[in-house]
Amino acid sequence: MVLLNGKLKYIAVVAIFYNLIILLVKEKFPYICTKKKFHAISNRILYEYLNNFVSKDIFRREDITLKNLNFVQTNLKSDKDAEIKENRDTQSVDDNMFQRVYKFILNFFYGNKKNRINKSMNYGKYDNFNKINDIFEFMRNNGLPINITSVCLIDTGLNIKDALINYFLNHDISTYNSYTYHSVNINYKKPDSFNFGINSENCDEDNYSECESTFLENHNGHGKYEDKSTIQGDSLKLIEKKYDKNVDLQRSGIDVEICKAFNNSKEKKNSLNIIPVIKCLEYCKTKNVKIIHMDYNINEQNEQLIQIMDDLKNSEIFVILPSEKLFNEKPYEDNSVIYPSSFFEKFENVFFIGSLDYSDMSSDDADIASNFQIQKNEYLKYRKNNVFLLDSINSSLKKRDDHDILYYEIKYSSAFFINIITIILNIYPNMSIKELRNILSYSIPSKETAQLKTENIFEGNFDINKFIHILLNRGINSSGFVRKYKDVTPNESTNKIFLLEDQKDADIEPQKDSSIDIYCDEGGSDEDIVSTSNGLDVYSEYSHSNNKSDQLLNDEKGLKYETYKDLYSVKENDIYVFESNNPTNSSFMQMNYDDKIKSKYLDNLEEANYQNHRTQFEINRNDNRYPIISEDNLRDRQNMHNIQMLNDGINYSENANNIEELYDNDFEDYRGKDLNPEYNKIRDNNNNKNINKEFGILNTWRKNNEGLYLSDSEEESQPFKWMDMHVDDIYQDRKKRLKGNNYDNRNGRVRRIYEDNKRGRYIKNRNMQKKKNFDRNLKNKRYLNRRTKRHINEKNKRIMREKKNKYNNSVLKRNEMKSHNNSQKTPKIIPRKYSR
């Protein structure tokens, strides 16, 4: 600056000033100066801060009923790249003077840049569900939800005074512009009339068919908190993707049906009969919904109610009940007590969801009532610092001034559970209830307290982070399952039954003594492994000591002996052991029995998979005629023959991929028609006609040389020595036919001549092109006289002649060496492995 004159000083000062202004504005308002950058693969947005939760490989279920069948592979930036990006201000040495001045000023006024991290990356104690919403948003933006799930909500009606629900019904951005929600079948007509639900709160046995109405409004506005949380769920959000002036609105993944079954008044809502609930359940079933949520827990038995619950179970409809807000004919309710549902242990499609408000520090304990203790009013003490089944929503659902949401936050658990199931059903609409329970069982960690272990009605804590990890990362392997082990004495009582009102004492069903491993079947009963393995006694005399062959036989016979652990069948003293014999990256919803049964035959080249799954292979044919053959010897011999015959273009069969499949495809028939009459007597005449064409021409030759083969008695003791002779004979016969036609020599000579000519033409054309380019460049130089040009041309011609002679000599020498080697080559002799 000192060496510059006045005009240049003015220009330098102005340039520095404007550079600082631009840098500061760019940091403070980045959307003004630069376009927002994000990685996209086929319009699928990738969030870089979800590295720890989202797997790089997202698998789609390949099903013809789904719309998307492709495989999406996302390459997210690693955490190391993010750290480098954060520390770039101190580590970069390529910054110019203006950038260094800008960073100094920025750190001076705003502090260190490292402490300013994206808010979406800061997941604190009460931001757990914000993290989950980000993951769900990632799934939706990447095209994973490919279906729409219908949900029926049974409660006290809609609070249309609420700003969010009012916006949800009116679709008016000016009313509630902070949210962008949308539903397919909810159309708002007028405040007291809706066309997406019914009102059955006035139904009874007399007017059961004529009690429906369309008035769904909640008078006092204290109801439908679960519906509001469902609407707030990520599955209903509408994503706006702006491309220039066009706006692409993504369709939501849920349909909502409303049924008002409970009265708004707190004094009457618990004293009503069960008829409105039954009416709403029937209405939801007629709407072909997939999920039904009731705002109140039902702890009552009714024949008509049980019948409709059976219909819902047969229709594969999920029913979700909260743990609190007990509903029965008695005017009694205590929200501080967690009651079980009367359907929980009888219907596998019923999910009993509850949560404990561990954020409330005013009380340390919560009351939990079991089935046999409801009439006695005796409750167990359970500490609130342990989450029950599902995390409470806490303050993450609180929006602006909606303080009532924070007050009812412990009741959002069942509603938020709807969003979880909706996300799964949007991706896999054909998933069964049992498959979902198998998935959820992996998301329930072990019970932490002894008080909760004593109650068989409660399953344990539900870890939502573990569930999301299973959903997006690896999922449950198709071959992985949970085995159930028990160690219960006969004196211990584990299974408690539901008590009616007239019963005073509980009939305790004793548990059978079991000191061995037992499994749990579909109905939750225990089944002894030894008792189910009686049908496999035929193979017991050939089994090995390591019991791995027994496992193979169980897989071949079917999977009915290996039942899988369900969420509803959890009892006390259970130990969950995750076993995965085949840890492969597969979709977590592929839980069908057909997917778990691995194929008997594996590829020859997959040595690792073969050795991991089957260490021994048993061959039993024709009433156990052949003994058990060691797998290693069998595979080594087969690999040796495959390599020998593939080099000469000889294959066993078009459909035989390995030695086991080859042995099962009537391998004895390849020997010929009359070589072994005992085999032909057992087999049908049609099987003798299905001889492979590759070996059929050798029948006449083998008839004349029958003495070279083994006898029947020798073949029983050494069955595979005949196979070696068979392979050797095929090889020799094939060699003779190839030499007779002189195919090998003629084809090789023509191929070598063609390759030499092709390379010679290529080199000649390349040299000619170089010469032309060189001559053209020389002629363009005008400072050279005619004599100099002539000398240069003569020199070039001499060089080209030398190169040509050198190339011809090398080709001639190479041909002489080939002819010399061919003349000295001796015919290949393959020794016979067995001779008489």
Curated annotation (Swiss-Prot):
Enzymatic reactions: Hydrolysis of proteins with broad specificity for peptide bonds, and a preference for a large uncharged residue in P1. Hydrolyzes peptide amides
Ranges where the record places region Disordered: 802-836
An example Gene Ontology biological process: proteolysis
E.C. designation(s): 3.4.21.62
Localization per record: Cell membrane
Keywords assigned: Cell membrane, Hydrolase, Membrane, Protease, Serine protease
Signal sequence range: none
GO molecular function, one term: serine-type endopeptidase activity
Family as reported in the entry's similarity comment: Belongs to the peptidase S8 family.
Function: Probable serine protease which plays a role in ookinete traversal of the mosquito host midgut epithelium.
Record protein name field: Subtilisin-like protease PIMMS2
Gene field: PIMMS2
